[in-house]
């Protein structure tokens, strides 16, 4: 259910962009992201930091897009969010508080060096996505960027999550694998 909630604002953004324009879609994205935050809190009594960061970025950059009537701001939002996520993972690693281990460590037992590799891999992923977004956003037509944002980055994230899951499964202790089968 929670994963479905995460995609609703993006689906609304895409649909309204195709029906109207980037400004209508951006306004709807801000509203849908705010509603998503409220619903998530109502259902789970907590909001993840990533959701909160995304909401703040959507509101600030989306608001600037609408107020200044300049779609460059919403394009920059995607790159900045990816950079913030990458920086957050780096800082957490330096401070000895691995974020991904914190998210999955209760369900999955892995050696710390494997958690570090997963962390570094996600830093690389977010960095590549940030750079790719910059290229597509500012070198391609708006329609191409919207499709890339919705389908390209979402598809890449899904695949990377799948590959991370395969890596985790490969390195799980044998007794944990047997429990899950």
Swiss-Prot record:
Its main location: membrane. It is a multi-pass membrane protein. The keyword Cell membrane applies. It comes from the Bacteria. NCBIfam families: ispZ (TIGR00997), PRK00259.1-2 (NF001324), PRK00259.1-3 (NF001325). Plays a role in cell envelope biogenesis, maintenance of cell envelope integrity and membrane homeostasis. This is Inner membrane-spanning protein YciB.
């Amino acid at each position: 259910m929670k994963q479905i909630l995460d995609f609703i604002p993006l689906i609304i953004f895409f649909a309204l962009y195709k029906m109207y324009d980037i400004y209508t879609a951006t306004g709807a994205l801000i509203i849908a992201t705010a509603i998503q935050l409220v619903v998530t809190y109502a259902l789970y009594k907590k909001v993840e930091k990533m959701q909160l960061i995304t909401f703040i970025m959507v509101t600030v950059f989306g608001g600037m897009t609408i107020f200044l009537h300049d779609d460059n701001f919403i394009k920059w939002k995607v790159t900045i969010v990816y950079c913030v996520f990458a920086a957050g993972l780096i800082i957490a690693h330096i401070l000895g508080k691995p974020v991904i281990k914190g998210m999955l460590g209760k369900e999955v037992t892995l050696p710390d060096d494997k958690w570090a590799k997963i962390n570094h891999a996600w830093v690389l992923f977010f960095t590549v996505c940030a750079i790719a977004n910059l290229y597509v956003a500012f070198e391609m037509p708006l329609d191409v960027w919207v499709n890339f944002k919705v389908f390209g980055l979402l598809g890449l994230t899904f695949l990377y999550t799948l590959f991370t899951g395969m890596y985790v499964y490969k390195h799980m202790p044998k007794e944990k694998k047997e429990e899950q089968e």
